[in-house]
UniProtKB/Swiss-Prot annotation:
This is Thioredoxin reductase. It comes from Rickettsia prowazekii (strain Madrid E). Disulfide bonds join C135-C138. Keywords: Cytoplasm, Disulfide bond, FAD, Flavoprotein, NADP, Oxidoreductase, Redox-active center. Homodimer.
Amino acid sequence: MKITTKVLIIGSGPAGLSAAIYTARSALKPILINGMQPGGQLTMTTDVENYPGFAETIQGPWLMEQMSMQAKNVGTEIISDYVERVDLSKRPFKIFTGTGNEYEADSIIICTGAESKWLGIASEQEFRGFGVSSCAICDGFFFKNQEIVVVGGGNSALEEALYLTNHANKVTVVHRRNSFRAEKILQDRLFKNPKISVIWDHIIDEIVGSNKPKAVTGVKIQNVYTNEINLVNCSGVFIAIGHAPNTALFKGQIAIDDDNYIVTQSGSTRTNVEGVFAAGDVQDKIYRQAVTAAASGCMAALEVAKFLNK
């Protein structure tokens, strides 16, 4: 089936739903394709305490459900589908979905987000949300006065480790090399922090824990040279080996930087293709917060309205 629309939004995280709310209120009748993970990364977060407007802790899935309902109530058509292919070579742009539908859109807002890179071991998946996390700001509070392991050696890992010392008694950074890639200033801060210790030349072999209640109790680490395995006791494991923006669909059709983020013009959500806009973590390598994603979704919607009214 071929469907035409003025605005098509790809992705249903805070950026996509914010863009939907604003374009709908501009009477543009947007269509939003919610993707493989409706609601985005927040659906993987149980307790949300840093989104403005809520005095008490809220649940990530609940917040995204509320945003989705709000978008629908103001006139957004939300489609349960995923995008397989796009053609951005000319307007109207063409979008092909997994269910076989074809959309033609005068403008597109890309809000496909970015996913945390994971270790790829079975135990990591088993305890995700039960002691395994990739967001210290989101989940660090729940490990107050406990021991935590951070995995990684770049800026993200060191920033996470330093932040977690606000909550944890002890933070152990496990890194597969014998030096960090992170900026020198971050390394200096980390080495001076009495709560942080570093284990070099090790990888995570297994995350161990209990089932009743389901919780992490430690990690087995493996020396990359000797293969010797040791146990480090901890209550939480934070994976900080980087983020991977979901931009594979758009490669070769739109400007993407060396880190695979969509390039937008300074102070704008406009891309190098007229009529195509990008918002949220798919183009934001610095902040990566729900509130900043929602804000950029609003920006994209306002810019789309201006573009279509030329």
